A protein has these predicted regions:
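Extracellular/periplasmic, surface-exposed regions of secreted and cell-surface proteins
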Residues: 133, 179, 185, 296-299, ...
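Short, small/polar-rich motifs associated with maturation and membrane association
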Residues: 1-338, 343-358, 390-391, 420, ...
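Extracellular/lumenal ectodomain signal focusing on beta-strand-rich modules
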Residues: 43, 95, 107, 127, ...
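A short beta-strand motif that forms part of the nucleic acid-binding face
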Residues: 80, 219, 230, 245, ...
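A surface-exposed, glycine/aromatic-enriched loop/edge motif typical of exported proteins
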Residues: 249, 254, 259-272, 351, ...
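Surface-exposed, extracytoplasmic segments of Gram-negative outer-membrane nutrient-acquisition systems
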Residues: 279-281, 621-634, 672-696, 729-817, ...
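Generic short beta-strand segments
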Residues: 207-208, 318-321, 808, 914, ...
Length: 977
């Protein structure tokens, strides 16, 4: 690993010593605002005319830009407004107002290692700006992306506070971790949980290979670039305060039987030796959801100060976020602090830093609470007549009182302390060259603690040993990158050339103890390192013809020397058709661009050391009763293991019509991923359950991204409408030799519920097809069955027609991967009021209601069972009889439900006080608002929510009784001084 960095250190040193002279530049600061309302224009592009040197305005409309000439001309553009040229005439401070325009304006987009004009962009990049993030309160940056960008599927991992989200960009392209790369202020990371959404200036999602190949072996699953807010560039400090408070409720409760309905159904159980007398006496009984779920508060407070102090541009912020869970004794608390600053040491040399600290506390409860809610009979109250917790073991040893679990298993928490940041220096010389050195770091400490006291509720709900389990993890990650950028503009040509080097190292250590004693295999240490070289060329000719080429070489310590290096090229071209002379007379298109790209990227989210054999230490009783320490092989070595690789092709069309009001972007893409790492089965006679990793599998994703947007301003009224559509098809093209299928995702019956095979999607559901319910013995005798069926049991299809019912009759039952994701948004601002609403939905996916397997071995049922279950011949052909055995519990189409949904994700109503009311009290802005989240959902699924994708692609879409989603109502206030 040390040898890997000898080249890195030498390369960086050569960069630093390469040039010894520089030319001065002039630093310009200013603010861009609306010519009518005076409101700040957020995200406007400010360019030095004749160059690609530019920047975008921040949340307050402010900008700072170093120009080559004190008499340069600034070109200011923003969608929906007119383009404006501003001669500097020696000024270093300019306030600019722009008005609504007839034509289309320029936009600046953040890309890998730089920025580009939207009109020059050849890649597929989606953007969410600060204004869109701030108007809708969210707990994480992942939530802010849901339904916002075509091709980006965001689904919460759980409804539990503090849990992250699963993000898939243009489908699932691997059998391993398919999560994207995050780049936060230049630091390359696997997650962005530490980022406070209110600190974000913009989020860019890089989707095609032209945009992601510059990140090489980490770009295959897409890249999310997060840029946080900088100083306002004003001389005086700007202080912003924001706070909101609200309440949360469970978004949807299960419809379960009441006490009397339960007693009646229980009495129908076959071989029931102790029926319940007089079912009506139990009445409504106890809805255990009301016992465990609660209304829970949510609160947030934000303070930020930004400005300039003695040439230091700064943005300082602090945030407190607290979200209590809708299940008792659960919740999440986070403190964050951030400092972003930049200081010009010389006219051509500036240094800066972006540092964030976060402290998190996640409180959870032990297993059994949600299961008890689902399985506990409603005829019981929380306590029995003696004041003890009720004992439900009469109805099954596996049933526990959820209130008791909540009381005895609530001492569980995870604490996270994290420091993430970058330190950089930018040196401009020879007018057109900029050298940047950037050092990034990520220091993270996690401490999980779970204390379970001695208790006994029943003979099956107890704990005999007072114990405290602790998991402590320490992660240290550093990154050092050096880039040289050449920007040159001629009359009809703009050229940008980037060359760079990157080095990164990660150290991870985990330790597991119980009551202070280190457990077998309780300590784990992993390290990896990466050395990379990168380059890119962007060229624009006559504002019409666009070309991009990039190449990155990555060397990784994860692989053997023979396969350590991977090379990831990309090519792209674009044609701004609307800029052609033959288009100048037409009045339809303000913008019309065709683009195409091709490239290769890799996936580094794989198991550590796949090329090496690994062992695990275990305790064995191999010699009588004496326990001995031993070791077992986990996987065999394979020195030929190499990168997972994705080859992607993209064709896109963008156009804007109706004087810049209506914009359409559409892309067709094909992602072909090959050399996917998978385990290779070995013969049983080898005598080990271990396996080697091999590059064998292939997966294809094809689809479309559509984005439609309408923006219009008339006087003091502005409104916008937006829609995204993202159809995608996922298919496995190849698996390992000798391994034609992969089974995963066991249900409570022990059956596997998913099968990954050639020709089907990853993690497709697989099982028996239910044809109906046997109505009488004659039907059973005349049909293939398992041999113990009774009237009222499922009739499974004999799909291969051999008159024998067995595992060969299982079939494809649907996919957890949506074939279509879509979103709608609408917003309006008028006379100080603003209203916005976002909708999000998916179609074409299925979910497995795995928790329903419990209905075949322990009592308690949903209301639909009471209403529709089989009670005699002709009574039902869809829901079986009440039973506690047989084969009805097998993985079948009965457990598979429609996973489609359409949700009102957020709605916000706000009012901004007029400026004239605030000037006398020192305020520059004050806005009150009310917001609702997850207020309405249209779904067919009978469970809490159809969203439970999980990080494991083989087990996505299986409901093992996940934490329910909450709906939220809150009020808030934002003020600026």
């Amino acid at each position: 690993m040390k040898q890997l960095y000898k080249k890195s250190n030498l390369f960086g040193l050569l960069f630093c010593l390469m040039f010894g002279s520089a030319f001065a530049q002039t630093r310009i600061t200013g603010r861009v605002s609306d010519a009518v309302s005076g409101d700040a224009i957020i995200g406007a592009s400010v360019l030095e005319k004749g160059t690609s040197n530019g920047i975008i305005t921040d949340i307050d409309g402010n900008f700072a830009l170093s120009v080559s000439d004190p008499n340069a001309i600034l070109v200011v553009n923003y969608t929906g407004y007119g383009s404006l040229e501003v001669p500097l005439a020696g000024r270093s401070q300019v306030d600019i107002t722009i008005a609504e325009a007839e034509g289309l304006l320029e936009e600046i987009v953040v890309v890998g290692y730089g920025v580009q004009r939207k009109s020059d962009l050849t890649g597929a990049v989606g953007t969410v700006k600060a204004k869109d993030i701030e108007r809708i309160p969210t707990a994480s940056v992942e939530q802010a992306l849901q339904g916002k960008i075509a091709g980006v599927y965001v689904s919460p991992s759980s409804g539990e506070p503090g849990r992250g989200a699963t993000i898939r960009i243009r489908g699932t392209g691997t059998l391993n971790n398919a999560g994207p790369l995050y780049v936060v202020d230049g630091m390359l990371l696997d997650d962005a949980s530490f980022v406070n959404p209110q600190d974000v200036a913009s989020i860019e999602v890089l989707k095609d290979a032209s945009a992601t190949a510059i990140y090489g072996n980490r770009g295959a699953n897409g890249v999310i670039i997060i840029t946080t807010k900088r100083g306002t560039k004003d001389r005086k400090a700007v202080v912003s305060l924001g706070s909101y408070y609200g309440t949360q409720q469970i978004a949807k409760k299960l419809s379960l039987v009441n006490g009397s309905e339960f007693a009646q159904m229980y009495n129908e159980l076959p071989n029931n030796s102790s029926p319940l007398a007089n079912p009506a006496q139990y009445g409504e009984g106890t809805d255990w959801q009301d016992v465990i779920f609660r209304d829970a508060p949510i609160a947030n407070a934000q303070l930020s100060v930004n400005g300039v102090w003695k040439k230091l541009d700064y943005n300082v912020s602090g945030n407190f976020f607290n979200q209590q869970g809708i299940i008792e004794e659960t919740g999440f608390e986070r403190y964050t602090g951030r400092f972003n600053g930049e200081y010009p040491l010389l006219k051509n040399l500036k240094i800066g830093t972006n540092v964030a600290y976060s402290k998190e506390l996640l409180q959870s409860v032990g297993g059994g609470v949600l299961g008890g809610v689902y399985r506990m009979p409603p005829i019981y109250s929380v306590f029995d007549s003696t004041g003890k917790y009720s004992d439900p073991t009469k109805f099954g040893q596996s049933i526990g009182n959820p209130a008791a679990d909540l009381f005895y298993k609530n001492d569980q928490d995870t604490r996270v302390n994290r420091l993430v940041g970058t330190v950089h220096a930018d040196w401009t010389f020879l007018k057109d060259f900029t050298f940047r050195t950037n050092y990034g770091f990520d220091r993270r400490n996690d401490h999980f603690r779970y204390h379970e006291p001695v208790f006994m509720v029943t003979t099956s709900q107890l704990n005999n040993l007072d114990r405290t389990t602790r998991d402590t993890t320490k992660t240290q990650n550093w990154l050092w990158e050096n880039t040289l950028n050449y920007n040159k503009a001629w009359e009809d040509v703009r050229l940008n050339v980037l060359a760079g080097q990157s080095a990164q190292e990660n150290y991870y250590k985990k330790r597991n103890t119980i009551n202070g004693i280190l457990q077998p295999n309780g300590e784990q240490i992993t390290e990896w390192a990466m050395l990379s070289y990168l380059g890119r060329v962007n060229a624009t000719f006559f504002d019409r013809y666009l070309f991009t080429a990039s190449l990155r070489a990555d060397g990784s310590s994860r692989f053997s020397k023979a396969n350590r290096w991977g090379y990831f090229p990309s090519l792209a071209a674009g044609w701004n058709i609307a800029e052609e002379p033959f288009m100048r007379s037409q009045k339809v298109f303000n913008r019309l661009k065709l683009r195409a790209s091709w490239g290769i990227t890799g996936n580094d989210k794989i198991q550590e050391y796949p090329s090496l054999g690994t062992i695990s230490n275990e305790l064995y009783s191999a010699f009588g009763d004496t326990v001995q320490q031993g070791s077992t092989l986990v996987n065999y070595a394979n020195a030929d293991v190499r990168w997972e690789t994705t080859r992607q092709t993209d064709v896109g069309l963008e156009f804007t019509v109706l004087k810049g009001r209506f914009t359409v972007e559409m892309d067709w893409y094909r992602r072909f991923t090959f050399d996917i790492l998978s385990d290779l089965p070995i013969p049983d006679y080898v005598g080990s359950g271990a396996f080697p990793f091999v590059n064998a599998a292939q997966v294809e994703n094809t689809g479309w991204d559509f984005t439609l947007q309408w923006r219009e301003t008339k006087g003091k009224v502005s409104y916008n409408l937006g829609m995204i559509l993202s159809p995608v098809k996922n298919k496995v093209l190849k698996l390992n030799e000798g391994k034609s299928e992969i089974f995963e995702g066991r249900t409570g019956s022990g059956d596997f519920s998913t099968r990954t095979a050639v020709g089907s999607p990853i993690g497709a559901f697989y099982g028996y097809q239910v044809e109906g319910v046997f109505q009488n013995q004659e039907e059973i005798d005349s049909a293939p069955n398992f041999g113990i069926e009774k009237p009222g049991d499922f009739r499974f299809a004999d799909l291969n027609g051999d008159s024998i019912l067995n595992s060969m009759d299982r079939t494809y039952l649907g996919s957890p991967i949506p074939t279509l994701t879509y979103g709608f948004s609408a917003g309006m601002e008028l006379f100080g009021f603003d209203i916005a609403a976002d909708f999000f939905g998916v179609k074409g996916n299925k979910v497995v209601n795995a928790k329903a397997v419990a209905r075949f071995d322990t009592p308690n049922w949903e209301s639909v069972w009471n209403e529709n279950h089989w009670t005699g011949e002709g009574s039902s052909n869809s829901v079986p009889r009440v039973t506690n055995g047989g084969h009805n519990y097998k993985m079948s189409s009965f457990l598979v439900e429609d996973g489609a949904f359409f949700r009102l994700r957020t709605v916000v109503l706000g009012y901004t006080l007029p400026q004239r009311w605030l000037s006398n009290i020192g305020m520059s802005r004050a806005r009150f608002y009310a917001s609702g989240t997850n207020l309405w959902t249209k779904q067919s699924y009978s469970g809490f929510t159809p969203e439970f994708p999980g990080d494991n692609s083989f087990r996505a879409g299986i409901d093992y009784l996940s934490y329910p989603m909450a709906k939220t109502m809150l009020v808030g206030l934002d003020v600026t001084f």
